[in-house]
From Swiss-Prot:
Any one GO biological process: DNA damage response
Assembly with partners or alone: Belongs to the multiprotein complex Integrator. Component of the SOSS complex, composed of SOSS-B (SOSS-B1/NABP2 or SOSS-B2/NABP1), SOSS-A/INTS3 and SOSS-C/INIP.
Family (UniProt): Belongs to the SOSS-C family.
Keyword set, alphabetical order: DNA damage, DNA repair, Nucleus
Chief place where the protein resides: nucleus
Phylogenetic placement of the source organism: Eukaryota, Metazoa, Chordata, Craniata, Vertebrata
Organism the protein comes from: Taeniopygia guttata
Primary role: Component of the SOSS complex, a multiprotein complex that functions downstream of the MRN complex to promote DNA repair and G2/M checkpoint. The SOSS complex associates with single-stranded DNA at DNA lesions and influences diverse endpoints in the cellular DNA damage response including cell-cycle checkpoint activation, recombinational repair and maintenance of genomic stability. Required for efficient homologous recombination-dependent repair of double-strand breaks (DSBs).
Protein name according to UniProt: SOSS complex subunit C
Length: 104
């Protein structure tokens, strides 16, 4: 099966066009950012984003808390072990509590 060289040329041209458009948008945004620092009134739209971010963070925390509660209830109902909710570096919602046994 022979590759279609004209199709590859079209893909390359398409990629170049997309990259050029992205570069143009990047420059446009950089220019807007520079002009907004020169004009304090222009940065009003930028100050609203932390409020939305805080709202999303709060909603995400509530969702995680609900997931932790459900996972904890399930673990206690189906296991004889003891579990706690704690942030995990690996994304675990609950962690098992293991007793320390002293060496004899």
């Amino acid at each position: 099966m022979a590759a279609n060289p004209s199709g590859q040329g079209f893909q390359n041209k398409n990629r170049v066009a997309i990259l050029a458009e992205l570069d143009k948008e990047k420059r446009k945004l950089l220019m807007q950012n520079q002009s907004s620092t020169n004009h304090p009134g222009a940065s009003i739209a930028l100050t609203r984003s932390p409020l939305n971010k805080d709202f999303r963070d709060h909603a995400e925390q509530q969702h995680i808390a609900a997931q932790q509660k459900a996972a904890l209830q399930h673990a206690h109902a189906h296991s004889s072990g003891y579990f706690i909710t704690q942030d995990s570096a690996f994304g675990n919602l609950i962690l098992p509590v293991l007793p320390r046994l002293e060496a004899e």
